Amino acid sequence: TWLMKEFGKTYYEKTAYISFYNNQRMQAVFDTDFDIKRIIMNLNIESGVAITPENTLIVLDEIQNAPKALESLKYFCEEAPEYHVIAAGSLLGVALHEGISYPVGKVDLLDLYPFNFREFLCAMDEEGLESALETKDYNLIDNFADKYLFWLKNYYYTGGMPAVVDAFRLNKDYAEVRQIQSDIVRQYEGDFGKHIEAKVLPRIRMVWDSIPRQLAKENKKFFFGQIKKGARSSEFEIAIQWLLDCGL
């Protein structure tokens, strides 16, 4: 959400932001038909922004809650390419797995991931170290092995979630890092119940809770016995697939 808004602020005169989360009115707008002129009029009113071609970025957030809005991207592309639209969905992988129509060939798809190590170095204002990795000059890299090890250990501790990296960049406070990480994990867990059937929820939580135990083993093979004694794959395949579709 922040990234889309920042992109709009940087490259467009105006940004019209629409979220479909708990927004039945806007979901209904797209359920009616794919008349782009009518849709734009509704987006104007909802966002409070006068949408004009070329210089307004239309942001459709939590689009997995409005399947027809996702499908409408095909018609924006074919019938009204002068309107610039960007969309995001936190559980879009789950939505697509459940059969929501996807506008194949009409959109550019971008998956977002946590920072990798090189991006982490740049965030820590260590562009020199990052550039040296690009050269693959291992004599040069070896000269600064102590610096790479220092930052690699910090990267392993902080991970790559942007809020965590930003806090560490500003304060270098390991306790603050751990608190933010814990908050993110709790937010994930709190989100589970909003998007899945109640009967599947306990199994998803059990798989999720078993992940640290799975990773702590020397043998990295996934053992269902780490979830619960006597567990079988058939009991948890839906839960595992759901977490995979979420990108978790």
PLM region spans:
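Conserved catalytic/switch belt of AAA+ P-loop NTPases
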Residues: L70-A87, L91-G93
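Structural recognition of the conserved hydrophobic beta-strand(s) that form the central parallel beta-sheet
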Residues: V59, H84-S90, D111, F120
